[in-house]
Amino acid sequence: FKLPNNKLLNYSNLINNGIISFKDTLLHSVDIIVNDIYKNESKLSFKIKSTNNPFLKKCTLPEDTFNKMFHYDAINKFTTNDIKIEMPAYSIYEDIMFKYQITNSVKDTYGNIYSIHNENTPVHLKYTLEIKADIADSLKSKTYIASKDLSGNYWYHGGKWEKNRIKTKVREFGDFCIVADTINPEIKGVNIFPGKKINKQTSIKLTIKDKHSGIKSFRGEIDGKWILMDYDYKESVLRYDIENDLKKGKHTFKLNVTDNVGNESNYNSTFIY
């Protein structure tokens, strides 16, 4: 079955958008076979039979079970005193009965938690999300809109303040709230420490972590000169491959790490090569 706004090109042989209609009440066998690029195959088999009940083409759910009908091929807007949502046309894959709910704030959040539809409904294009909140001006630079997953983790989505409203763009549904990050990133040396002899090493490694808004940038220097460092996001490891022209003797290593709201940490060490 192909959703109306699904633009993938691998449905070249699709008939009637994948909808199968039976004009009888006989029992039919159905096999669904899926192959990957390496010719691995999975098969699902089942039986199906039509009934005499007419297919309901229109939803008969009462309107109080959802807030607004969103159409996939139109601009969709939803506004309350607390939030504002604006989705470009073709942001969703099919028409949806949009749902919205407010729950009270929990630890580490500023203001309510806003449940925007359902996290299991995919979103194709980024849309604008704006949240109203009364937050002290001195704290605004450290706050941002975050999504909250089922495990209670918060994920950074940024945001810019205009008076008492913060606005950003997101590409998912789910629970959203405002959180603050006032904690500096964490830096730890893996194979470097002050005064270490590294003449037998081929690289310098450190771990960098930020548990809240996430790492935005980093800058490494040796003897005041910028060096190229590779960042392994999954392992949180920064690596500098020592170049052949590094002179023998004592050197100074510096690393600056900044998170997404401007908190920063510095690591300084000397080493002997």
Each predicted region: which residue ranges?
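Long, low-complexity serine/threonine/glycine- and acidic-rich segments characteristic of extracellular
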Residues: F1-N52, Y154, G158-W161, R165-T168, ...
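Proteolytic-maturation and junctional protease-sensitive modules
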Residues: E119-F176, S217-R219, W226-I227
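Predominantly extracellular/luminal regions of secreted and cell-surface proteins
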Residues: Y72-K99
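Proteolytic processing hotspots in large secreted/extracellular or virion-associated proteins
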Residues: L56-K58, D64-D73, K99-Y144, I192
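Proline-centered linker/hinge motifs at extracellular inter-domain junctions
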Residues: T182-I187
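Short, solvent-exposed loop/edge segments of extracellular or virion-exposed proteins
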Residues: G189-G195
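Primarily secretory-pathway and cell-envelope proteins
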Residues: M87, K196-I198, T202, D210, ...
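Short edge beta-strand/loop segments characteristic of extracellular beta-sandwich folds
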Residues: P88, E130-D134, S203-K211
